Each structure stands twice: as C-alpha cells, then as structure tokens.
C-alpha cells in the first residue's frame, strides 16, 4: 500500500493524495545509526558542506532529502499550531549493542555498548512526519467512505487525558491531526495490518468499500482485536522495557559506575522519589529527595544491583541545579510518558505448592 502526496514546491502545501496497491523497489536503504552524523540540518541546507566518506548512495539523494526535510519541518510546524505548543524531544533514544556473542543468542555475559540517537534528528523527523501524513490521511479517507478502522485519539492535552484506541476517526490532540490510524507498520503491529486490509478495500471499491471491507461498522471482531491488542502491546512494551533495564544495569556494573546525575520526575513507593538518569535509560528510586520538585537535578550514589529483580536504589549526594532558577532544571516529560517506565520485577513464590515427585526430586 503506497501513498502518493502532491506538494506545492514553493508553499509546501499538500494539494493532493493518491493511494495505490503496488510493489515498490528499494533504491537506497538509509540507516539512522550509520548516517545521522552526516545528515545534519547544516548538510541538508548548505550544498557546499562536504563530509569525508559520505556514501555515494546518500549523495545521489541529497537534493531529495533536503526537500523532504523542508517539508517535514513545515508539517511539524503546522501540527504544533493545532497542538497549541511545540513538541519537545528532551530525552534521546538509546541503542544497545552486545559485543562478544557474534550474533548468537545472548547469555547475559556480553559486553554492553549504549549509544544515543537524539530524537528529532533530520532523518528521524523526515520518517516521523511522513508516517503521520500517511496515518492521518488514510484514517480520514476510511472515515469518508464509511469504512471502520482502528484509530488512536486524544480529546485534549489536559493533564490526565489519555490516548485511546477505538473505531471512530476522532482528533488526536497530542499529535495535532484530525484523525490518526495506525497503518504504516503492518510487519510490526497486527492493528496496522488490519487497517491496511480496510485501506485495500477502499482502493479497490471506492464509494462501495464499506460493503466489501473485511470488517463492517460496529463489527464485534474489530472491537475484540482492539482489546486483545491493548493487552499484547502492553505486555510487549513491558518485556522490552525489562530487557533494556537488564542490559543497562549490566552496563552500570561493567563500567564500575557508582554515581549518576539524575532528574526527579515523580514520587515513588515507600517515601522515595523516582529519578531518571541524565545519560542512561534508567529510572530508579532514591532516598533524600523528599520535597524536591519535578525537574530537580541531583548527583546520586548508587546501591547494589540486583540482577534477579532488576532492582537498584540510590541516595542523594547533592542537588546540582539552582532552586531559584528553573532554567537549569532537568527535562520533565508529560505525565503519560512518565508512566511508561521499567522498574524492578515483582516475584511471587507459592511456598505451599507441592513439587511433583521424580527420581531427581523424590517426595519426602
């Protein structure tokens, strides 16, 4: 499923869209981890900038990337007008690399390398804005044709207003679009595949697509897919977060890190406060941060790492920011983002459960 977008080159206004069913040959596979240091905003806007060892396949599409970056910035600015405030990428994405296993299944003893990819980098922005255009365009198109889809919506950006999944094309305040379907990652998410089936019906049948689409309005199976996906996606995210936490704690041990700079972001259990490390993907509770506001920056002494429960505690050594000057506070994300953090694993053991007798484990 391809979306073709016609853009006025001078004004960057989208003047038309067309969806096609086709096979698309890949001319160049551009990877963030290999090219972000080359594809900077300066490189895209100033043709005189030349960087040593730039791949020819990248030079061949430099003009196209420059235009796409201009378009992406314009699209982002338009969404921010609808949102009412700019999007902030205060925290980076982290990449993990395990050295020493030659691509085999990890054993837990590998050397961990953690690198940073700043969100909002030019290539990242181009891809993100293209996906938003596709997902919002297809979502609105399905709604116009009366074809149900699976949407994510958010009524407002007021505190406590969460993102919801449903079958109606409703505004997504957090993104700043009239509707937002998930359709651009069918290999990664089943919901996207379902939406693409609906979009294919729209392409093939036009105004009669609602009669031919696999899922009809108020289809109980569609609601069941949403319910099942929510549970599966939460479980997937939890597993991913736990896995990243394990390797982050291994990194802390391997590098002999005993102190970290961190930022307070919310109250934790037992009178502790949760902090987020400034330079690692790590959230943990600390003692001694009582009555400190969100955004307070601290130097923290780390306790022992528990590799079974993935637990780690810290103690405040000193406050690094000026209490009377908010300009040096640490980054504070939206409340919903703060909820998606990985913490220790809770282990429940039934001491009354009788083990099955076997030659290796005879009954008493």
Regions found by a protein language model. Name each.
Residues 1-296, 305-312, 327-344, 348-364:
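Electropositive polyanion-binding surfaces
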């Amino acid at each position: 499923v391809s979306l073709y977008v016609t853009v006025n080159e001078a004004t960057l206004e989208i003047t038309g869209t067309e969806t096609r069913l086709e096979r698309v040959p890949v001319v160049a596979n551009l990877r963030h981890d290999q090219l972000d240091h080359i594809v900077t905003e300066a490189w895209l806007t100033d043709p005189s900038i030349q960087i040593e060892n730039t791949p020819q396949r990248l030079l061949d599409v430099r003009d196209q990337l420059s235009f796409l970056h201009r378009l992406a910035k314009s699209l982002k600015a338009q969404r921010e007008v609808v949102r009412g405030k700019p999007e902030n990428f205060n925290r980076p994405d982290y990449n993990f690399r395990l050295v020493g296993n030659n691509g085999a299944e990890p054993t837990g003893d590998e050397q961990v390398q953690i690198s940073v990819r700043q969100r909002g980098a030019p290539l990242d922005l181009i891809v993100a804005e293209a996906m938003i255009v596709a997902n919002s365009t297809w979502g609105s198109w399905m709604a116009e044709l009366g074809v149900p889809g699976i949407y994510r919506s958010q009524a407002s950006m007021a505190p406590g207003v969460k993102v919801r999944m449903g079958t109606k094309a409703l505004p997504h305040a957090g993104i700043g679009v009239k509707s937002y379907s998930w359709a651009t990652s069918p290999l990664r998410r089943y919901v996207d595949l379902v939406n693409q089936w609906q979009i294919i019906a729209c392409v093939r049948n036009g105004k009669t697509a609602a009669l031919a689409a696999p899922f009809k309005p108020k289809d109980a199976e569609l609601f069941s897919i949403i319910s099942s996906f929510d549970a599966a996606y939460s479980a997937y995210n939890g597993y991913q977060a736990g896995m990243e936490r394990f390797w982050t704690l291994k990194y802390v041990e391997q590098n002999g890190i005993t102190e970290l700079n961190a930022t307070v972001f919310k109250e934790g259990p037992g009178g502790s406060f949760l902090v987020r490390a400034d330079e690692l993907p790590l959230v943990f509770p600390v003692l001694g941060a009582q009555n400190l506001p969100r955004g307070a920056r601290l130097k923290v002494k780390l306790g022992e790492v528990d590799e079974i429960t993935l637990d780690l505690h810290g103690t405040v050594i000193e406050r690094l920011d000026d209490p009377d000057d908010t300009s040096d506070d640490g980054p504070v994300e939206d409340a919903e983002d703060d909820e998606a953090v990985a913490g220790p694993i809770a282990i429940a053991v039934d001491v009354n459960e009788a083990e099955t007798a076997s030659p290796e484990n005879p009954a008493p």
